[in-house]
């Protein structure tokens, strides 16, 4: 696994483990059922069958919540299969269907960065941060992206913003370390 793939997988897993609050209406029952079947097939390592169920969920999705849910769930699995470009396309559709879903924007930002689209990644991660200001994930990703690009001022701004959040002590220590490193000439 290439180092960027390892980083992407870690960031993706962090994002996948903590979705934002579900929408008021939520996805349709038929869509949820197909996603459940897809996940069951995936756990049995029946990727071919999982793909069929994800595609059925997408076909059954008629309302914005269902469209966003089906496409986001499929995108998460596509990443694990190494199909990042298709995952990114699914997330673009999910974001258009439900532009208020911070987790979709976060994941889209990560995949845009992986594809070399840093301006698009910054836009998506910034949108996720605006939608979920108390979520450290978009700030963490933005700070790392800015730092990698050599933009120490914006990286430090994101890390300072994280210190205003309720963080686990271990993460707080890492943020303080990052700020100290960024302050060095």
Regions found by a protein language model. Name each.
Residues 70-73, 107, 141, 174-178:
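Canonical tetratricopeptide repeat
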Residues 21-23, 153-185:
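Terminal, low-structured helical/coil segments at or just beyond the last alpha-helical repeat
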Residues 60-63, 97, 131, 165:
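Structural marker of alpha-solenoid helical repeat scaffolds
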């Amino acid at each position: 696994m290439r180092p960027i793939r390892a980083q992407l997988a870690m960031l993706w897993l962090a994002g996948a483990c903590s979705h934002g609050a579900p929408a008021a209406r939520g996805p349709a029952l038929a869509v949820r059922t197909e996603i459940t079947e897809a996940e069951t097939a995936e756990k049995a390592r029946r990727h071919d069958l999982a793909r069929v169920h994800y595609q059925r969920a997408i076909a059954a999705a008629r309302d914005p919540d269902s469209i966003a849910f089906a496409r986001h769930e499929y995108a998460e699995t596509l990443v694990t299969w190494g199909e990042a470009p298709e995952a990114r396309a699914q997330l673009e559709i999910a974001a258009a269907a439900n532009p208020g879903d911070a987790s979709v924007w976060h994941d889209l930002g990560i995949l845009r960065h992986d594809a070399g689209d840093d301006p698009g990644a910054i836009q998506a991660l910034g949108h996720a941060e605006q939608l979920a200001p108390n979520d450290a994930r978009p700030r963490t990703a933005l700070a790392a992206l800015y730092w990698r690009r050599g933009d120490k001022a914006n990286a430090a701004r994101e890390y300072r913003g994280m210190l205003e959040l309720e963080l686990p002590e271990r993460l707080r220590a890492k943020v303080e370390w990052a700020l100290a490193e960024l302050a060095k000439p």
